[in-house]
Swiss-Prot record:
Residues 1-184 are annotated as: Large ATPase domain (RuvB-L). Belongs to the RuvB family. Its main location: cytoplasm. Homohexamer. Forms an RuvA(8)-RuvB(12)-Holliday junction (HJ) complex. HJ DNA is sandwiched between 2 RuvA tetramers; dsDNA enters through RuvA and exits via RuvB. An RuvB hexamer assembles on each DNA strand where it exits the tetramer. Each RuvB hexamer is contacted by two RuvA subunits (via domain III) on 2 adjacent RuvB subunits; this complex drives branch migration. In the full resolvosome a probable DNA-RuvA(4)-RuvB(12)-RuvC(2) complex forms which resolves the HJ. It catalyses: ATP + H2O = ADP + phosphate + H(+). InterPro entries: AAA+_ATPase (IPR003593), AAA_lid_4 (IPR041445), DNA_helicase_Holl-junc_RuvB (IPR004605), P-loop_NTPase (IPR027417), RuvB-like_N (IPR008824), RuvB_C (IPR008823), WH-like_DNA-bd_sf (IPR036388), WH_DNA-bd_sf (IPR036390). Mg(2+) binds at T69. It is found in: Cytoplasm. Gene3D superfamilies: 1.10.8.60, P-loop containing nucleotide triphosphate hydrolases, Winged helix-like DNA-binding domain superfamily/Winged helix DNA-binding domain. This is Holliday junction branch migration complex subunit RuvB. GO terms for biological process: DNA recombination; DNA repair. ATP binds at L23, R24, G65, K68, T69, T70, E131, D132, F133, R174, Y184, R221.
Length: 338
């Protein structure tokens, strides 16, 4: 199974792009959750507007699906400026970056998603652009080559990354604002589901929204995806209204349990417990047993299971925790004996 095929994937899926756009809040007052980030940005944006300056360069980092792209667009709206969006892999050469920078107006926001994937030559050109608002490029070849100085208007670079540790120190140090996007609380996710249902013109009860929220892995993108699937179920199997019972039936049909675990998550944990006494068990052995590539297990399944406390990584392999045993109604001490 690929990341794009998985219902509980936090990665953006191409088919969802237009729907995600319709669900995005436009301003900080509409943005649900991430209170610390919002409070800080409110101050920084207001101060920059009072001084009639561009906002400091801003780095947004955290797991996928938490609203980094949306926050970049909100920043541009709050500053009342245009935004140009691109991604690290899309800027292959220094010339690509020059073309983008030359289109910016004073105060504009340049949003670079997956900024940790910028080629080194492009990243190094960004240093002077971010710090002093100019770039130097070499024109000509051989003995006729000479640098050409291009001044740039003051602008705000908003970078987004799921892997802040992969950013080089020189690039990271040039961001004046660094904000960590965290997993959402269930109450905030419930409010997001209610808001999205209203946009979809779908009638939903609070307990139905909460049932979706608590199975959404703390991630708005997953919550909205599950809402769409539950909406389909409600329209075909019921009267179109989503209450707790309908949400539970739909999500159970989709094999998403109350902790947000899907079929493969459950299979992985049960394999560790039933076949290997809870571990330790090696990653390659686990992968063979559940029929997935080792990279898929490590990148797609393990992070959430570790974050929620279902498994632990040790030098000898993976171990199922008491929480994992309890989730399936197993006795931990008895299971470890076996």
């Amino acid at each position: 199974m690929t990341e794009e095929e998985r219902l509980l994937s936090a990665a953006s899926q191409e088919a969802e792009a237009s729907i995600e756009k319709s669900l995005r809040p436009q301003f900080l007052a509409q943005y649900i959750g991430q209170d610390k980030v919002k409070q800080e940005l409110t101050i920084y944006i207001e101060a920059a507007k009072n001084r009639n300056e561009a906002l400091d360069h801003t780095l947004l980092y955290g797991p996928p699906g938490l609203g980094k792209t949306t926050m970049a667009m909100v920043i541009a709206n709050e500053m009342n400026v245009n935004i140009r969006t691109t991604s690290g892999p899309a800027i292959e050469r220094a010339g690509d970056l020059v073309a983008i920078l030359n289109e910016l107006e004073p105060g504009d926001v340049l949003f670079i998603d997956e900024i940790h994937r910028l080629p080194r030559v492009v990243e190094e050109m960004l240093y002077s652009a971010m710090e002093d608002f100019y770039i130097d490029i070499m024109v000509g070849q051989g003995t006729t080559a000479h640098p050409v100085h291009f001044p740039l208007p003051p602008f705000t670079l908003v970078g987004a990354t799921t892997r802040a540790g992969m950013l080089s120190a020189p690039l990271r140090d040039r961001f004046g604002i660094i904000s960590h996007m965290e997993y959402y609380q269930e109450q905030d996710l419930k409010e997001i589901v209610l808001r999205s249902a209203d946009i979809f013109q779908t009638e939903i009860f609070e307990e139905g929204a909460f049932e979706i929220a608590r199975r959404s892995r703390g991630t708005p993108r997953i919550a909205n995806r599950l809402l769409k699937r539950v909406r389909d179920f409600a329209q075909v199997q019921s009267d179109g209204k989503i209450d707790r019972a309908i949400a539970d039936k739909a999500l159970t049909l989709l094999q998403v349990d109350h902790q947000g675990l899907d079929y493969v998550d459950q299979k992985l944990l049960k394999t560790m417990i039933d076949l290997y006494g809870g571990g330790p068990v090696g990653l390659s052995t686990l992968s063979v047993n559940i029929g997935e590539e080792t990279e898929t297990v490590e990148d797609m399944y393990e992070p959430y299971l570790i974050q929620k406390g279902f498994i632990k990584r040790t030098p000898r392999g993976r171990i199922a925790t008491p929480f994992a045993y309890a989730h399936f109604g197993y006795d931990y001490l008895e299971g470890r004996k076996n």
